[in-house]
Amino acid sequence: MGNFKIYTSFKPKGDQPKAIKQLVEGIKKGYKHQVLLGVTGSGKTFTIANVIEKVNKPTLVIAHNKTLAAQLYGELKELFPYNAVEYYVSYYDYYQPEAYIPETDTYIEKDALINDDIDRMRHSATLSVLTRQDVIVVASVSCIYGIGSPDDYMSMHVTLEEGMKTERDAMLKKLVEILYIRAEEEFRRGAFRVRGDVVDIFASHCLDKAYRVEFFDDEIDAIYEIDPLTGSRQKRLQRIFIPPNSHWVTPEPRLKKALETIEEELQERIKYFKERGEELFAERIEKRTRFDMELLSQFGHCHGIENYSRHLSGRLPGEPPFTLIDYIYAGPSKGDFLTVIDESHVTVPQIGGMYEGDRSRKQTLVEYGFRLPSALDNRPLTFKEFEHRMNYVIYVSATPGDYEIEKSGGRIVEQIIRPTGLVDPKIEVRPATNQVEDLLEEIHKRVSRGERVLVTTITKKMAEDLTDYYTTVGIKAKYLHSDIDTLERVEILKDLRLGKFDVLIGVNLLREGLDLPEVSLVAIFDADKEGFLRSERSLIQTAGRASRNINGTVIFYADTVTDSMKKAIEETERRREIQMKYNKKNGISPETVKSKIKDILSSIYEKDYVTVDVVKEEAEEYELNEETIKKLEQEMKHAAENLEFEKAAEIRDKIFKIKEKMLKLGMKLTV
């Protein structure tokens, strides 16, 4: 069995040794759920790495977006250079799911651009968990989405050995069966090329190596690892393992059976539609399904093959799909593995929200004859199914949610001390009545020292107006909101760090992982307005944005002190005292964190499948109909009569948005 081994000159410091010891002991005692409550900058990843090394179990690390997953992957790969550290996220650079809009009779075909590097890494991840014990997979929510059967993936691989008796053409046929293609000109991953008795194979999990198999009559004479670009031999091998080029591979007998059961379901569905007089839907489902069946029978594959996964894997209706987690169970660990859920207060709700979002879209496709009902079984796991598959779990967060605290039975391991000595920012409460002018004075102080300021407001309108006002009085300010796309978000945050502007204003600056050491002041307007963005957890997370700077300060602008504010202040003060006591005892003088400007990319959120917005910047969309518009117009007039002009303007903007969406969907408007 392979053992995990960390290679680094760093040693655990501060709270890390205690946290590592407690978590390891908890696992040894059989505690299935534990919480690591670690503040920003306390080295939580290093702690988790040490736990992995000591418990020596295959580990699944789940992050709530691709970029944070990539950051964790990079850190763990550096710490474990001789173990298998893998990356498993959605392989789509662009993803438009298949959908149907009944109101306009609009069918949107699935459209996707697959990232070849990520596809390779997914193959590498599944192969590692199936064949190794010393494996860490850093994944996004993709790990609960359906892929093909691990048993089929393993049983259909091709193993080749020097001296093995096999015909060249028989081997080529096997490669085609597991979806490799012949490519003489463009030799790429998932392809093979033939030159007489020499066959080069570029396996699905390989990056910078390929294999050369040399035949003599009906025997493998030699096997080499080669450079795929130059074709030069690197080393001689005795044996190679070629996994399928897709996770959706099916043995021929099961494929034949699957086509029979698809036919049976198709006949039932045609009958269902005809009995209801829905001839168009009956014709549609027959035409579309028969086209796919023809491709499956000829090539073993078709566009949207995942929609037939229940038939292809032989599962019963309603049974959960195979996921990455099933591959872990099928490997050497047999399910004895560790799961680490990073930023659990965000990731846990996201995992829980995947199933319903996926089902509602597919339900419409089924109802209107675009897909068979069995397509609903190509889905992510429900939260209960996910829970059932977990073994040992560590939830990692600076502000763990109620679910994590309850599941752990209060077994919370704290990591409050930062090895750098940085102390949590001091929180001040000031009156909201003069917040704009008061903050202006504070901004001038920070700008004169070359520091930056973050400001959070209650509404987007207020963020925009505040930005305009500060700009007119000579402050270099910008605002950030949910309508700004990922790439522009990168640039804005990068420019803030570079000093191209000094003040960033927004509604939701709750970005766990935001690395902005130049920020010395976080101002929270209307901190006493209770709600998700002013909850205890949100206030602590937002305040944490100033924790990387030695001059870090937080100002709560409020006319009253809410329960959430009180708890956030008390918790921050508790953490400050622990850190200051440690600093005094060890003679540590804290310094502002120094990080390269390029690191800003690690803080940008990318969507993976349908990312659930746990933190919303505005209310859920209204229903798209004229009744809604009339109702909102009445509310707008009422607000104007009461001299609530800002509220009236917000309602007016919502009405414009609804009308714009209705027109885009081809819906009639008479108001």
Curated annotation (Swiss-Prot):
Map motif Beta-hairpin onto the chain: 91-114
Q: What is its main location?
A: cytoplasm
Domain called Helicase ATP-binding: residue spans:
25-178
Residues binding ATP, per UniProt: G38, V39, T40, G41, S42, G43, K44, T45
Task: Give its localization.
Answer: Cytoplasm
GO MF terms, alphabetically ordered: ATP binding; ATP hydrolysis activity; DNA binding; excinuclease ABC activity; helicase activity
Check the record and name the CDD domains matching this protein.
DEXHc_UvrB (cd17916), SF2_C_UvrB (cd18790)
Swiss-Prot/TrEMBL GO biological process terms: nucleotide-excision repair, DNA damage recognition; SOS response
Q: Decide whether keyword Nucleotidyltransferase is in the record.
A: no
Offer a single GO CC term for the protein: cytoplasm
Where does the Helicase C-terminal domain lie?
A: 435-601
Name the job this protein performs.
The UvrABC repair system catalyzes the recognition and processing of DNA lesions. A damage recognition complex composed of 2 UvrA and 2 UvrB subunits scans DNA for abnormalities. Upon binding of the UvrA(2)B(2) complex to a putative damaged site, the DNA wraps around one UvrB monomer. DNA wrap is dependent on ATP binding by UvrB and probably causes local melting of the DNA helix, facilitating insertion of UvrB beta-hairpin between the DNA strands. Then UvrB probes one DNA strand for the presence of a lesion.
Oligomeric form and interacting partners: Forms a heterotetramer with UvrA during the search for lesions. Interacts with UvrC in an incision complex.
- Family label: Belongs to the UvrB family.
- Entry text on domains: The beta-hairpin motif is involved in DNA binding.
Q: Protein name, please?
A: UvrABC system protein B
